[in-house]
Amino acid sequence: MRVKDTLNLGKTKFKMRGNLPVKEVDRQKAWAENKMYEARQKLNEGKPTFILHDGPPYANGPIHMGHALNKISKDIIVRYKSMSGFRAPYVPGWDTHGLPIEQQLTKAGYDRKKMSTAEFRDLCREYALKQVDQQREGFKRLGVSAEWDNPYLTLKPEFEAAEVRVFGEMAKRGLIYKGKKPVYWSWSSESAMAEAEVEYHDVTSPSAFYGEQVVDGKGVLDTDTYLVVWTTTPWTIPGSEGITIDAGIEYAVVKPANDDRKFVLAADLVDQNAEMFGWEDVQVIKTVMGQDLDNVTAQHPFIADRKLVVMLGDFVTTESGTGLVHTAPGLGEDDFNVGALYHLPVLVPVDDKGYMTAEAGADFAGVFYEDANQIALDKLKAANALLKYMPYEHSYPFDWRTKKPVIFRATPQWFASVDKIRDEILAQLKDVKFQPDWGQRRLANMIKDRGDWVISRQRVWGVPLPIFYGEDGEAIITPETVDHVADLFAEYGSNIWFKREAKDLLPDGFTSEHSPNGEFTKETDIMDVWFDSGTSHQGVLAERDYLDFPADLYLEGSDQYRGWFNSSLITSVAATGKAPYKQVVSQGFTLDKDGHKMSKSLGNTIAPDEIISKMGADIVRLWVTSVDSSADVRVSTEAFVKISDSYKKLRNTMRYLLANTSDFDPQTDAIAVDDLQPVDRHMLYQLNEFAKSVRAHYDHYDFLNIYKELINFVVSDLSAFYLDFAKDILYIEAADSPVRRSMQTVFYQIAVSLTKLITPILPHTAEEIWDFLKEPEDFVQLAEMPAVLELTDANEQPDDGHQSAWDHFMTLRSHVLKALEEARDAKLIGKAAEAHLDLYVDEETKRLLDQLNVNVQQILLVSGLDVASLDQAPADALTFDHLAVKVTPAAGEVCDRCRLTKEDVGSDSAYPHFCARCAAIVRQNFPETATEGFDEN
């Protein structure tokens, strides 16, 4: 027998290296075979529900890090809730309609004009489903547990039917109407756009200052006076019908010495504009208030038969420009609103594709609108109206899909009225919790500021607007027609709209006063895709009987304040009178390491599968918890390497716990809490506090603090303290000694509790650990989270002084470690086991040590220890608060078994190289060695 055969060296087949890229795939196959998601749902039947409603990602392209951050966050929450007494079904969804899919088919060579609309839509559907399959596999590889076989898709017949019914409810309330209003118009998509589909970029536009001669000054202005107008869109001047000013702004009539004309502009802006225009010796003839200029008329600068009306509006400022704004009612929202008050005509001199029409005049017709800027400038120069041209940098709206600029353009569109229910929406919003807190203000401000929602789109891949037209052109939207269309969509899908004539889409025998001859036509526009996803509260939550409405939680990126959070709130309040969610949590965007947006064109993307193939999904999942996702998150390879190091620390700690409980049976070997060694009972208390804190963080979706506490517990409480001195007990003491079984009891409890607590974050690793634990559940996912009172007997909770006593001891320990380090640096000792400590403590510290009743020498890993009064400390002792420490080399010889330096080595003649403790343990447990001795190796 060898000496090491007498040691209880831990053994486990749990590998130090995770080999996650390979093992995770096998683990996921096992989950699928055992129907893990379904098993958890069955286990939780009858329990309170927790519903996290999945915001549908767009079905186009492989998943990216933003997807990973979001889906893993949701999975962590749902897994935790499922292990915490809740029935928490998770139904994933996809947004499957919209322009990008149409564009992909066009790129692939399909010509929409050479096939029927229904045929083109079939191709769109086929493409979307392939994208769903691709993304689904990506999410599954991340370890996300969900109802993958029955997701919700906005193209599914039942979803489309529910969407139509929401539209019908809104129509019943008089919230749906048709109007000709300026809307965001994407010439690159040839369709109207909602606010949520627009993003802003900084651009440089041609800025023009020009004069318009007064025709009728209403007794306030002379006809030799020119109104100085400013615009950043000269191409819109052919659509100009008026000039807007502010009633409360003071305007000056000025005469430059170097110009024969008089000019009107805001008094506060005279000086800066005079310098820019090159005016000399400017004389202020008089000032008037804006209200006095109401209904003054002026001559259009290059359209001879058009007179412009001066109007009062509330959107004019003196922050820039001249205080007079060129107004084209057909080409701007503010322009339209003020023009309507003055009954101005609405000219739209630009077509669907962005080309100027004949309405703009012969010189403009057929010219792309951006090129029309120069024509307008040339005409202003020719009319001697242009005072100044200069480039102007400002923020401008772009189509978020095509990345091309959009324009405002008045077209006939269908709208959902927000104004009629604005107060109702805001009232419902007050009862919703937000994380971060500012989210409520942000969404409320968006609701306050947004106009009515343009819900129609001039595309084909989407849900048709269920609207018919009579022979007189009047729209027909009745409960009867809407319900019938919804029933048809539920049975056949929305493609039926494009396959049947209008009469075949109406209820049998339907009649209308608008069609005395029974002839009907149908709407060709589709609904905004935000209306699709925005009605998921009915298409999913209300549709599936195992879900609940409203949802407990919506969790998405911060861009969804103007997107899904917004559209869902409007449709839900409109159709049901309730907000669709009880709580909203928002996350930031994923950026590259330098804080830039990730894009393929910049070559700065890191794809989830890139990390997974090298490090594993659990590394990506752990990374998600390590960042503050409430703000924008930077992604880098270095960050994942760092997380991998943290994972290794956790894995190695779990390996140590498993190895040293491999000979421990919790059913027969566990020590009762009352009989645990003091230090073990303390660690059970620490585990209890750790579990309590981590569970609170889970409850508040505070992943970052879970990560911090997890790593701190593993590194500080376990590795740097408890596990640090554990070998002297676990390896050296007799295998079944009470002191060793006491520590194993706590080791095992730590392993079980820690495994449960990390399961929502690291499900693959947790299941691998669980295989080595002797617990009744086959899978840790089917276990429950550790309850706090499960860890420490309710009657054995430490008193208030417990933690302060241990805090004091840990401070003492840190001082001792510093003293040992200095002794090593001075070559006094090689390692702590060669040291003897003399501790000189005050009365309070002595009392605390007695109270703790722990083996201080063993915890400090030294060979000898004496404790004396602080006033006996020698001059060369290292002093600290309440403590002095003197380190000397331990006397005696090194024990071949425990490696401590002891004076009693050889006291048992049968074991000449063992200390008395080791000799006694070996003699009792391996009596044959007393006569046979040991082999050399």
Swiss-Prot record:
Its cofactor is Zn(2+). Zn(2+) binds at C895, C898, C915, C918. It is an enzyme of class 6 (ligase). The keyword ATP-binding applies. L-isoleucyl-5'-AMP binds at E556. Keywords: Aminoacyl-tRNA synthetase, ATP-binding, Cytoplasm, Ligase, Metal-binding, Nucleotide-binding, Protein biosynthesis, Zinc. A motif ('HIGH' region) lies at residues 57-67. It comes from the Bacteria. Pfam families: Anticodon_1, tRNA-synt_1, zf-FPG_IleRS. One of its GO terms (cellular component) is cytosol. Its main location: cytoplasm. ATP binds at K600. Gene3D superfamilies: 1.10.730.20, HUPs (3.40.50.620), Ile-tRNA synthetase CP2 domain-like (1.10.10.830), Valyl/Leucyl/Isoleucyl-tRNA synthetase, editing domain (3.90.740.10). A motif ('KMSKS' region) lies at residues 597-601. GO terms for biological process: isoleucyl-tRNA aminoacylation. The keyword Zinc applies. It catalyses: tRNA(Ile) + L-isoleucine + ATP = L-isoleucyl-tRNA(Ile) + AMP + diphosphate. Signal peptide: none annotated. SUPFAM superfamilies: Anticodon-binding domain of a subclass of class I aminoacyl-tRNA synthetases, Nucleotidylyl transferase, ValRS/IleRS/LeuRS editing domain. Binds 1 zinc ion per subunit. NCBIfam families: ileS. PANTHER family: ISOLEUCINE--TRNA LIGASE, MITOCHONDRIAL, SOLEUCYL-TRNA SYNTHETASE. Catalyzes the attachment of isoleucine to tRNA(Ile). As IleRS can inadvertently accommodate and process structurally similar amino acids such as valine, to avoid such errors it has two additional distinct tRNA(Ile)-dependent editing activities. One activity is designated as 'pretransfer' editing and involves the hydrolysis of activated Val-AMP. The other activity is designated 'posttransfer' editing and involves deacylation of mischarged Val-tRNA(Ile). Belongs to the class-I aminoacyl-tRNA synthetase family. IleS type 1 subfamily. IleRS has two distinct active sites: one for aminoacylation and one for editing. The misactivated valine is translocated from the active site to the editing site, which sterically excludes the correctly activated isoleucine. The single editing site contains two valyl binding pockets, one specific for each substrate (Val-AMP or Val-tRNA(Ile)). This is Isoleucine--tRNA ligase. It comes from Levilactobacillus brevis (strain ATCC 367 / BCRC 12310 / CIP 105137 / JCM 1170 / LMG 11437 / NCIMB 947 / NCTC 947).
